[in-house]
């Protein structure tokens, strides 16, 4: 069986963000930041024009997602112990065990994840990208979406979506 894919990485597929990771034993890193980079692979049937997708149509979608996270403090809103609250004055309070933080709402993104690991960030971005690709390209016969979030050189968390072969739409490849 033949498969086709496109790999997309641009220098602007990056975001700088603060976070702290919470470990299984309850300990946590100090608040710190990374300059994250995002890499995307999309595998699908070829269009009648011999393309998986046009790069120039995908790049703005990825850029919008990474830009939405840039220069924010990422808080894991679904962590079972961490608590957060937005005060009436627009300040977000975050409590984890004995730690207390307060920051302007505009600086904080409370994410629907249980930890701000690179794996969870890749999952969130990957799922958002998948939804946007489906909405923008309803005829896309997507087989696989791979999205990596690199927090430091050579160290990435990866989200991988693979379509169920029985449910995956197909397009006739270019002749």
What are the language-model segments listed below?
Residues 1-175:
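Charge-rich, low-complexity N-terminal segments
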